[in-house]
A protein has these predicted regions:
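Non-catalytic connector elements of ABC transporters
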Residues: 1-70
Length: 70
């Protein structure tokens, strides 16, 4: 599969927390202690059969990133 997304990070799923409609998926990136947390639909988790310990690639759309500071 080829994608236009430039921000691609390989890692391992460390947590899947499924709610009623949405789910939180945490992926520890390879080569460090950084964890990316993503909110996805429950259906996406079930369709992709996401499980802890499974390798995954995180794709981040640059125009959709929000950064905040205090």
């Amino acid at each position: 599969m080829r994608l236009s997304t430039q921000n691609q990070f390989k890692g391992t799923i460390v947590e899947v927390d499924i709610g009623t409609v949405m789910a939180i998926v945490r992926v520890r990136l390879d080569g460090g202690d950084h964890v990316v947390t993503s909110s996805v639909t429950k259906d996406a988790v079930l369709n992709l059969d996401l499980k802890e310990g499974q390798p995954a690639t995180v794709f981040i759309k640059a125009s959709a990133v929000i950064i905040g500071v205090e």
